[in-house]
Amino acid sequence: GKQHEYVLNARNHEHPIMKGLPNKWKHAQDELYDRMRGPGNIKDCLYTAYSDKGTGGSGREEPLIFTVDYGNARIFHTMLGHAGETVENCPAMQCAGFQITLLRGAEWAATGKVTQKVPADFPTEKQVSNRSNYKR
């Protein structure tokens, strides 16, 4: 569907990646993929977002940040962070929420723990927080 801003909804506050993260936060303009499935099963659904039919979506909550059960591996998956039209116009990757959840997910996948603090510029339910100095 069409790229747009949308709110992510927390689904599992107990997972180490989620500790200290808000219940809801607004993601920058990005694609919201739906009906995505792979060979692994979702183990821990961390965040979902409503996929609005008005933007070409499914009309339901879709899992966007989750862990995958695949053997003994720790796998973190995010559907966020699609490229913009130019290096300068890349709001999805500039979003502090995308950057922080990706870093926390990578740390958890590597170590099973998350030591990173949630920064003050993490987005809120009403406000996107972009780090404009990010370059892809």
Q: What are these model-predicted stretches?
A:
Residues 1-74:
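Catalytic beta-strand/loop cores that center a nucleophilic Ser/Cys/Thr
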Residues 53-64, 69-136:
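Extracellular ligand-binding/catalytic regions of CAZymes and related secreted enzymes
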